[in-house]
Curated annotation (Swiss-Prot):
Pathway: One-carbon metabolism; tetrahydrofolate interconversion. GO terms for molecular function: methenyltetrahydrofolate cyclohydrolase activity; methylenetetrahydrofolate dehydrogenase (NADP+) activity. GO terms for cellular component: cytosol. This is Bifunctional protein FolD. One of its GO terms (biological process) is methionine biosynthetic process. The keyword Amino-acid biosynthesis applies. Its EC number is 1.5.1.5, 3.5.4.9. PROSITE patterns: THF_DHG_CYH_1, THF_DHG_CYH_2. It comes from Burkholderia pseudomallei (strain 1106a). Belongs to the tetrahydrofolate dehydrogenase/cyclohydrolase family. Catalyzes the oxidation of 5,10-methylenetetrahydrofolate to 5,10-methenyltetrahydrofolate and then the hydrolysis of 5,10-methenyltetrahydrofolate to 10-formyltetrahydrofolate. NADP(+) binds at G165, R166, S167, S190. Homodimer. Keywords: Amino-acid biosynthesis, Histidine biosynthesis, Hydrolase, Methionine biosynthesis, Multifunctional enzyme, NADP, One-carbon metabolism, Oxidoreductase, Purine biosynthesis.
Amino acid sequence: MTATLIDGNALSKTLRAQAAERAAALAARGHQPGLAVILVGDNPASEVYVRNKIKACEDNGFFSLKDRYPATLSEPELLARIDELNRDPKIHGILVQLPLPAHIDSHKVIEAIAPEKDVDGFHVANAGALLTGKPLFRPCTPYGVMKMFEAYKIPLQGANAVVIGRSNIVGKPMALLLLEAGATVTICHSKTRELAAHTRAADIVVAAVGKRNVLTADMVKPGATVIDVGMNRNDEGKLCGDVDFAGVSQVAGHITPVPGGVGPMTITMLLVNTIEAAERAAAAA
């Protein structure tokens, strides 16, 4: 393999240790950072994600609250619970695990979270503020990717960056953060013609579509940085990303693995956002 591996586990360990120090300092002043996680239904993947988030809180000195409800929970009941958490001074961050059951409007639920507790960064107030470069919170996955660029000294200013995927959770905010850092950004998606023509010209490619082998070695410029946000299963049932890792790692300069790349960083930045929320609350108290 010629590419340098961007190790999300190692970087997460460093950043979580820093978060734990900040949490301890806040707790000593009577402001232990608190995160509430709401899970509705029994989606197995969601259960794993929630378990990992709660464990990360416990391991780093955060107060955590897990609310688990059956899939039959009504939308008004969920909104009422969010309202309670908005008013709870022990809770600094509120996270509703997506996807929600079909009868619940996810958009309405996210908008019900107080913007100052929206540690996912999905509320329209934070999403809009991202355009101005002044959000209260940056969405966790793109924020984690930016920390990877910083840690591995990947130059962004003047770089050509391609983001494959246009979701509100990763693609769009990723493009905005790269733009803010001085990159020239192209967003590609399912309707893009000749994807390879864009990716071959890119110094940085972020793949975030949830589709195996969307990026192969012949589509990558030698020495480019490749970030794989995808989370899929291969034919053997093993975790894999959107990138053909075996092939692309022979061409790229830097690459993230799946697992062990972007995934751990997403939870780490959730802790960082919760710390920032707690620090703001403590300063205002």
